[in-house]
């Protein structure tokens, strides 16, 4: 898949408009378009993925600087630039010719017209601005991407590109010639990648076949990005401006137009030839469908920019129809889940972010663009931008093939398959494989192109590619038949064609399958086996082999599978072809996802990646590394693809996404041993087919036979096959489990590759497939094939794939498995996990056996998962696949995943119809799993996962399906799996995390290695997944295991049962975050699927999910503890969560959407620390595990949730703890969050009433702050205040961020419920975007868990309040904890009122939860710790101060009596500004919150203030200082105010009711929270200082006092909830701000230069991020790495900048959370200025809050990385938020004035 990361470049010349990321030139100009957007558009489905493959000598335009310097044209030079090791090969490798031969035959020339969004510069797009990207896959050249000058259409452009355009080689040269991308800012470490776009320049301009990828996705602003054609198309949406292919242009135009109309953002339409045109037509149709289905998924997510994804995706899906456009296609996939709910917002965001063509026309001069540079987190290869993970230039040629794959994916698939892709948001495979073939084929056969369905049927042979791409149609559940190519799986008839195509393709290049294969081959030009492209099948085999060799190219396998599938059955064939496509995608995507996300993992598991790739070769470490990189590169794109698929409607996603995921997973598995896999593919295909039939009742024996015979061997291949079949199966699933599988199955299928994800999704019973259903079958298979298997079981077509696949896979599998085993063994030995091998192998068999039965269950669970799950699953699946399935997850993760899945599956439906199919699939999966295990989860997988999890899995199998009864390891695994199942889905959605996954990969891997399998696995898996978790519609998926929960969750979310939902979200969030964070694969499994599904089990795992990384290091048996705890927690607190979840099930999806991308990073850090704290601090305390569910969940899920997690982590955890609490409260989830502190206590706490929990929480906070210092990956018992501060402070900033994110998430949750999470994703993205978004509710639940600590009674009260308040559409004012918990529920119900439910919650949680809930519980224990330790985390401090100050008495008051007030406090904390409802735009809530903010109490006060926000109608005039007085919403505010005031007053430091000063934030930010409108409200109140101090100072008192100067500062405050930006002129009362100096751990009063601006509040609409702040900022919070650095710097320095004021104003809004945590304030501060925000707080908080609140100021990425003075408002673009780097993606927010 070509991942076009179009990094928005602003104001660059048109020539800069296109930027080639990863060797593909992408319009750099799209100022609006974030790299992610482009990635979404192009990258996801189109060329985008290729975009950041290798950095050209010049930094890619995609780099952060990109926005400023828009070297739009990043070309993959024929000679690889510095970073283009692989690309060069791609172009030059002979293998490419073989691989590309067919492609060339097709004349695959993908032309992407990049219309830079020059909205700032000019709204209209000018031809001169448009640049065409020609992506040619030439047999000899490989993928050539060249950008034509904007002047002419493709021809002129091509000419411009150079005469070489016509020739691929020339094109390459030309490309080099063509604008070498100026170095965007090196900030994105991305090497500028040159893409030879001109491989077939001539073809493109001449032959209709040439695909015209018009990536016109820069509507606002750089409209004229690069491609005149695009511009012409764009401008004359209706007319056919492009001379090259007028018909195509027409199509394009129409597509664009429709996109614009639908999304108001025409991403880019891809039409090159009549075929394209036809395709475009179909695409347009699809686009509409996509849009309606949720085209607006978080496309950014897939790139790893959750926020971007969200914004870009919706639009992209809408706009990315023809092109897959991949903001729409790719992005859509990522944001699929959220897109549907958020279409409007997405559009807006895209219009802003992506600058859709329409929006460009009506673009504001002032807009904010977020540029994300995805650096694939290959630890070793920093060159590669994960974000651009389109193609990694690895020394291995994998990158190249990867690139080619993407090129084919993005290119061919983009246009021909684009439609499908678009439709099938699940573009992962489609785009990849299908793209090229499709392009060629599709282009050739216009009819096919016309309609996906039509093409599918019409160009049977050719359409196979298209069919693969056609997955898109699958994606569009509604239009499966139309999605010809992609639909193949869906359409039974089509499969025949695909089969024919497969056969033909095998023989002929033009065949779809062939094309797909070839594309893949193209992708891995240097792949060894690619050389034999003569036979498509052979070629595919070669490709597959090559992939296994080191290319991740699974084309070969795909082809075999494809053909097999086709032969077997039409649907099967289609699926197979899809699979082939997927295979293509998998190499790049899966590798990237698996690899990039677990760059470390891969690096660590060189064997893993290598094993996948290099396995064929000897376990050559070098190759392994290269492979690892390739995997990452591929995986990353894969993630994008996953994201895309997720974006599709659940049904579509289920079908397509599932298969795709499967394919990817397969590819990944295949990657383990391509050749073996090919063999395996054949045998496995047959096997799987048999299994499917068996599942269907047709081939039970055969399936079993195959599986059993090739248990080890078949595993990888079968996994692949099952993947392919999974898709088919998924298509067929509706037959068997239409309703269940349809919605859920597909997700599962998608998860298939992710297996964890799939399992999770299914389960539903993803794990169960492993353990539950098929006690005797291969659990490994179940897990790996879980998603796929379920699908397979359901889909006979999948079965049909069996025979051919079998043959192919048989030998392949043998080789692969043998090699993989060998390599895995080697790897393990390297890692010192030699024992893994035996366990791995034996476990695999075990798993395989267990998985089969489970698989059925999982299938059932899958089916059970509704569309929501499916949708979420798809998206998340993507992540999961790469994380979990990658499928290291399948193998090593498989155990955990299976485990999690197993329980889920059992829950879902042990008696699945697809037992046989599942068995077969399980077998395959087992093989794949094993392979993957070796590949990815070597350490965790093999040793712990395989062994422990397998045991657990077995146990689970035995255990009742409904019961998540996993052994310790198994339990958390099961949890993970279940969470994976439920959260994996979410994970998929969270693509930003994908990018972030890489970093997680690194860490978790290590951690995993250190600890037992269960622990390590859960940690590792969860960690990567955590980021993914967001995507994880785990909440949605929760139902699999706990269908009730799914239902409950949705209602809760929507109906006010936030508890469960939150928990789920939390879980999801956490899981996703973890996944992203660390071992995606591993983490995915760890991803507590159970948490969501089975609250009781999930809980512990939740903790693990959140804390897992920490846990891994912290305690070897943390996992076990987690496992045990989860059950206990499930029993106790979890049930609450379940209840909440049950209530919010409907909203689950939204919750998922809330996945935050931001949290990824922050959470990575935060999670790591908190988790470590849990693991380390909790290593001793088993409860830590238990608590983790509460704590970790919050932490992980929300990134804020870590409040509880943070509890141990003084700074971060301290502040997070409260958040966690709230989450806990939301889910009544066991309050175990305190678990952090309460190792021993934890368990009791979870079970015990709130008091115990509270005590625990308090203890945890105290312990964390006093006893523990969390260093990066672990909690250290002794904490250096400074180091801890530093690290923890980063955490605290993160926590603050998360808290804000939580708050945002909460609000977002509302949104989510309201919009299914699309906004959630964005909104949550505001702050905790990543965490929150994916699992805001979950987080809330987690938080509630913490709050649970406050007390069950409090929780109950909160629930009551929730119920009461829910109608109000405000987060309930119930006690903070309850509020948080309630909020999720309530917010969900009052979706309209997206008010800062979460925001408040976060704040409140931190402050109130920590103070009231946490401290109150253990005021005495917490008091020192809370007050002191919390000081570390300003927020905590705030909370704690109140708690401390207000003894239990007050705490109690607040807690029990003040549930409301807590809520208030919560709200206030975040919003500090008691915003009147959204309507209170003009009202200046007397900043009760601000007032409150003043004192540490401020957090309480702030929270109170927020309640007004919640109340919406209440606009306390009086300063919060009077706490009660200012509260127009007397009840909440008064209540909270009183307690808060009590708290505020009690605290000496807080005592100063600077609230009055702070109160200045009177302007009730009229958050149109409900509206979630992008409005900027000006608040005059000088609450800013208070919040900052609140955030900064443990005792916000000083801050408030500081905030005495009445100079007004204008701040952009973002209502995370509504995503509205308020421009608040807060009097900078105190010129000084209290900033927290992370280095010293002290709060410093820094004189802040307050901008004196109109005091009168003004409401300004901030279109860009306002709508989906999540899309931007939320994606990345301050990254742990950045935080420390930034914090110290920011801590003092940024404060002067608007940041301080911002912090303050955010304080009212988000600052209060920041107040809770110094970070929180700063977090909010980032709104105004990412850098300006109070550095310490702002760093962490800023990223979250900033991202989320990226309002007019677009605090840019709420990354407070470098402090950038955002306050200054010079015209022109400026980086508002400091570049945030989550380890994978560097994102910076640019504000264009």
Swiss-Prot record:
Q: Where is this region: Disordered?
A: 156-189, 204-362, 407-505, 757-809, 829-917, 1090-1147, 1161-1187, 1229-1249, 1408-1465, 1482-1567
Any Pfam family:
DUF4585
**Protein name stated in the entry:** Uncharacterized protein C4orf54
Write down the species.
Homo sapiens
In this chain, composition skew of type Low complexity spans 248-258, 289-307, 434-450, 485-505, 1113-1123, 1513-1528
Q: Where is the composition biased (Gly residues)?
A: 317-342
According to the UniProt record, list the residues that bear Phosphoserine.
1187
ATP-binding is among the record's keywords: no
Q: Which residues carry this modification: Phosphothreonine?
A: 733
Q: Where is the composition biased (Polar residues)?
A: 166-175, 238-247, 463-476
Q: Give the Basic and acidic residues compositional bias ranges.
A: 227-237, 277-288, 829-839, 846-872, 1161-1174, 1231-1246
């Amino acid at each position: 898949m070509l991942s076009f990361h179009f990094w928005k470049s602003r104001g660059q010349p048109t020539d800069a408009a296109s930027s080639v990321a990863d060797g593909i030139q992408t319009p750099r100009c799209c100022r609006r378009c974030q790299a992610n957007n482009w990635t979404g558009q192009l990258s996801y489905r189109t060329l985008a993925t290729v975009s950041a493959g290798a950095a050209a000598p010049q930094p890619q335009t995609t780099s952060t600087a990109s926005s400023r310097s828009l070297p739009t044209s990043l070309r993959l030079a024929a000679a690889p630039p510095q970073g283009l090791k692989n690309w060069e090969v791609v172009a030059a490798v002979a293998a490419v010719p073989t691989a590309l031969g067919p492609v060339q035959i097709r004349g695959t020339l993908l032309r992407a017209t990049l219309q830079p969004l020059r909205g700032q510069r000019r709204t209209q797009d000018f031809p001169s601005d448009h640049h065409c990207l020609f992506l040619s896959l030439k047999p000899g050249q490989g993928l050539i991407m060249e950008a034509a000058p904007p002047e002419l259409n493709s021809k002129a452009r091509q000419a411009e590109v150079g005469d070489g355009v016509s020739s691929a080689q020339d094109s390459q040269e030309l490309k080099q010639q063509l604008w070498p991308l100026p170095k965007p800012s090196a900030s994105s470490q991305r090497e500028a990648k040159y893409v030879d776009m001109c491989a077939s320049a001539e073809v493109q301009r001449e032959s209709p076949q040439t695909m015209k990828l018009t990536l016109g996705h820069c509507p606002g602003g750089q409209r004229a990005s690069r491609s005149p054609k695009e511009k012409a198309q764009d401008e004359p949406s209706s007319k056919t401006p492009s001379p090259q292919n007028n018909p195509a242009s027409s199509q394009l135009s129409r597509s664009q137009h429709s996109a614009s109309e639908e999304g108001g953002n025409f991403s880019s339409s891809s039409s090159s030839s009549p075929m394209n045109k036809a395709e475009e037509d179909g695409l347009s149709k699809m686009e509409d469908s996509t849009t309606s289905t949720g085209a607006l998924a978080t496309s950014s997510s897939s790139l790893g920019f959750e926020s971007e994804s969200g914004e870009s995706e919706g639009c992209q899906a809408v706009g990315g129809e023809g092109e897959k456009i991949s903001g729409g296609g790719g992005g859509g996939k990522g944001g699929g889940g959220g897109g549907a709910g958020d279409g409007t917002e997405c559009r807006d965001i895209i219009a802003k972010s992506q600058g859709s063509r329409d929006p460009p026309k009506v673009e504001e001069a002032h807009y904010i663009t977020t540029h994300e540079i995805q650096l694939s987190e290959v630890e070793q290869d920093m060159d590669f931008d994960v974000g651009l993970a389109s193609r990694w230039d690895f020394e291995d040629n994998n990158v190249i093939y990867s690139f080619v794959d993407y090129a084919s994916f993005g290119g061919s698939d983009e246009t021909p398959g684009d439609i499908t892709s678009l439709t099938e948001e699940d573009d992962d495979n489609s785009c990849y494989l299908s793209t090229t073939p499709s392009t060629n084929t599709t282009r050739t056969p216009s009819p096919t192109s016309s309609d996906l369905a039509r093409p599918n049927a019409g160009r049977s042979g050719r359409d196979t590619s298209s069919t693969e791409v056609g997955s898109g149609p699958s994606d569009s559940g509604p239009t499966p038949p139309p999605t010809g190519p992609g639909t193949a799986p869906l359409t039974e008839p089509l499969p025949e064609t695909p089969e024919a195509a497969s056969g033909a393709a095998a023989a002929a290049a033009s065949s779809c399958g062939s094309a797909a294969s070839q594309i893949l081959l193209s992708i891995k030009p240097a792949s060894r086996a690619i050389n034999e492209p003569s036979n498509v099948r052979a070629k595919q085999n070669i490709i597959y082999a090559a992939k296994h060799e080191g290319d991740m190219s699974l084309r070969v396998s795909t082809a075999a599978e494809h053909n097999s599938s086709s032969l077997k059955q039409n649907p099967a064939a289609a699926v197979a072809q899809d699979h082939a496509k997927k295979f293509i995608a998998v190499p790049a995507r899966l590798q990237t996802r698996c690899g990039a996300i677990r760059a470390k993992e891969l690096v660590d598991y060189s064997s893993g990646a290598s094993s996948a790739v290099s396995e064929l070769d000897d376990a050559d470490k070098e190759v392994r590394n290269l492979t690892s990189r390739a995997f990452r590169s591929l995986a990353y794109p894969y993630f994008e693809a996953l994201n895309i698929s997720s974006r599709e409607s659940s049904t579509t996603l289920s079908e397509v996404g599932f298969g795709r995921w499967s394919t990817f997973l397969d590819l990944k598995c295949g990657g383990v041993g391509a050749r073996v896999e090919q063999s395996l593919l054949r045998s496995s295909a047959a096997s799987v087919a048999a299994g499917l039939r068996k599942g269907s009742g047709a081939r039970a024996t055969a399936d079993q036979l195959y599986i059993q015979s090739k248990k080890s061997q078949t595993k990888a291949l079968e996994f692949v096959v099952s993947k392919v079949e999974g898709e088919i199966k998924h298509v067929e699933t509706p037959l068997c489990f239409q309703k269940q599988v349809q919605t859920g199955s597909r997700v599962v299928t998608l998860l298939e590759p992710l297996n964890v994800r799939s399992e999770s999704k299914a389960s539903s019973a993803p794990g169960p497939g492993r353990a539950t259903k098929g006690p005797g079958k291969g659990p490994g298979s179940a897990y790996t094939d879980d998603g796929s298997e379920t699908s397979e079981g359901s889909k006979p077509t999948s079965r049909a794939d069996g025979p051919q696949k079998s043959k192919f896979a048989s030998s392949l599998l043998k080789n692969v498995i043998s090699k993989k085993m060998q390599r895995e063994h080697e790897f393990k030995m390297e890692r010192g996990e030699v024992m893994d091998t035996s366990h791995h192998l034996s476990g695999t068999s075990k798993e395989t056996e267990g998985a089969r039965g489970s698989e059925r269950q999982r299938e059932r669970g899958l089916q059970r998962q509704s569309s929501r799950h499916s949708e979420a699953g798809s998206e998340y699946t993507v992540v999961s696949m790469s994380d979990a399935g990658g499928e290291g997850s399948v193998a090593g993760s498989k155990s955990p995943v299976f485990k999690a899945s197993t329980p889920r599956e059992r829950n879902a439906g042990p008696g699945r119809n697809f037992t046989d199919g599942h068995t077969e699939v399980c077998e395959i999966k087992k093989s794949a799993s094993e392979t993957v295990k070796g590949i990815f989860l070597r350490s965790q997988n093999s040793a712990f996962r395989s062994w422990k999890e397998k045991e657990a899995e077995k146990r689970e199998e035995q255990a009742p399906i409904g019961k998540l009864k996993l052994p310790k390891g198994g339990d958390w695994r099961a949890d993970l799996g279940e969470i994976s199942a439920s959260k994996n889905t979410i994970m998929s959605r969270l693509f930003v995390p994908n990018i972030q996954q890489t970093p997680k990969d690194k860490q978790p891997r290590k951690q995993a290695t250190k600890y037992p399998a269960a622990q390590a696995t859960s940690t590792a898996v969860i960690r990567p997944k955590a980021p993914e978790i967001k995507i994880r519609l785990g909440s949605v998926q929760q139902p699999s295991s706990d269908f009730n929960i799914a239902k409950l969750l949705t209602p809760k979310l929507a109906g006010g049962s936030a508890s469960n939902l939150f928990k789920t979200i939390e879980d999801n969030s956490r899981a996703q975050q973890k996944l992203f964070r660390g071992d995606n694969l591993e983490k995915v499994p760890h991803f507590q699927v159970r948490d969501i599904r089975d609250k009781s089990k999930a809980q512990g795992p939740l903790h693990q999910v959140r804390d897992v990384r920490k846990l891994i290091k912290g305690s070897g048996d943390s996992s076990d503890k987690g496992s045990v705890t989860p059950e206990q927690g499930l029993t106790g607190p979890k049930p609450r969560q379940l209840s909440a979840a049950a209530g919010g099930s409907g909203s689950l999806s939204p919750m998922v959407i809330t996945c935050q991308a931001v949290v990824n990073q922050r959470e990575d850090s935060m999670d790591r620390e908190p988790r470590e704290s849990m693991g380390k601090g909790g290593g001793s305390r088993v409860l830590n595990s238990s608590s983790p569910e509460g704590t970790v969940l919050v932490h992980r899920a929300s990134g804020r949730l870590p409040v509880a997690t943070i509890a141990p982590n003084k700074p971060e955890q301290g502040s997070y703890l409260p958040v966690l609490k709230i989450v806990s409260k939301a889910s009544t989830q066991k309050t175990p969050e305190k678990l952090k502190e309460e190792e021993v206590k934890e368990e009791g706490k979870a079970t015990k009433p709130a008091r115990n929990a509270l005590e625990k929480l308090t203890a945890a906070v105290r312990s964390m702050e006093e006893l523990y210092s969390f260093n990066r990956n672990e909690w250290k018992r002794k904490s250096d205040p400074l180091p801890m501060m530093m690290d923890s402070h980063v955490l605290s900033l993160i926590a603050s961020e998360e808290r804000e994110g939580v708050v945002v998430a909460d609000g977002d949750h509302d949104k989510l419920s309201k919009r299914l999470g699309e906004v959630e994703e964005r909104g949550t993205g505001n702050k905790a975007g990543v965490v929150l978004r994916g699992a805001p509710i979950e987080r809330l639940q987690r938080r509630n868990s913490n709050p649970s600590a406050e007390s069950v009674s409090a929780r109950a009260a909160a629930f009551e309040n929730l119920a009461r308040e829910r109608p109000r559409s405000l987060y309930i004012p119930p006690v903070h904890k309850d509020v948080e918990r309630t909020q999720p529920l309530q917010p969900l119900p009052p979706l309209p009122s997206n008010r800062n439910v979460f925001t408040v919650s976060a704040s409140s949680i931190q402050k109130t939860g920590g103070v009231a809930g946490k401290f109150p519980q253990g005021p005495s224990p917490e008091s020192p710790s809370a007050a002191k330790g919390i000081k570390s985390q300003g927020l905590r401090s705030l909370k704690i101060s109140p708690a401390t100050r207000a003894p239990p008495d007050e705490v109690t008051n607040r807690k029990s009596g003040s549930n409301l007030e807590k809520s208030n406090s919560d709200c206030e904390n975040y919003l500090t500004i008691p915003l009147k409802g959204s309507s209170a735009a003009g009202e200046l809530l007397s900043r009760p919150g601000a007032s409150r903010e003043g004192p540490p109490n401020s957090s309480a006060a702030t929270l109170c203030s927020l309640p007004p926000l919640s109340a919406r109608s209440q606009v306390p005039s009086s300063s919060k200082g009077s706490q009660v007085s200012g509260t127009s919403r007397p009840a909440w505010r008064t209540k909270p105010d009183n307690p808060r005031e009590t708290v505020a007053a009690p605290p000496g430091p807080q005592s100063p009711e600077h609230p009055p000063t702070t109160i200045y934030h009177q302007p009730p930010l009229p958050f149109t929270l409900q509206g979630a409108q992008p409005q900027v409200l000006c608040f005059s109140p000088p609450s800013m200082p208070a919040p900052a101090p609140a955030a900064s100072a443990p005792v916000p008192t000083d801050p408030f006092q500081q905030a005495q100067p009445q100079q007004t500062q204008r701040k952009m405050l973002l209502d995370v909830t509504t995503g509205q930006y308020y421009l608040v002129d807060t009097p900078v009362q105190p010129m000084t701000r209290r900033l927290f100096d992370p280095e010293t751990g002290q709060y410093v009063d820094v004189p802040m230069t307050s901008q004196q601006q109109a005091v009168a509040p003004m409401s300004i609409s901030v279109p860009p991020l306002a709508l989906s702040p999540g899309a931007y900022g939320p994606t990345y919070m301050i990254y742990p790495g950045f935080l420390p650095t930034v914090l110290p710097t920011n801590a003092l320095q940024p404060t002067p900048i608007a940041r301080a004021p911002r912090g303050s104003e955010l304080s009212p809004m988000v600052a209060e959370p920041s107040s809770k945590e110094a970070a929180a304030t700063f977090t909010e501060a980032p709104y105004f200025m990412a850098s300006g925000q109070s550095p310490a707080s702002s760093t962490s908080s800023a990223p979250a809050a900033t991202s989320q609140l990226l309002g007019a100021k677009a605090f840019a990425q709420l990354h407070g990385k470098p402090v950038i003075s955002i306050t200054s408002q010079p015209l022109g673009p400026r980086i508002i938020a400091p570049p945030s780097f989550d380890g994978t993606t560097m994102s910076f927010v640019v504000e264009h004035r």
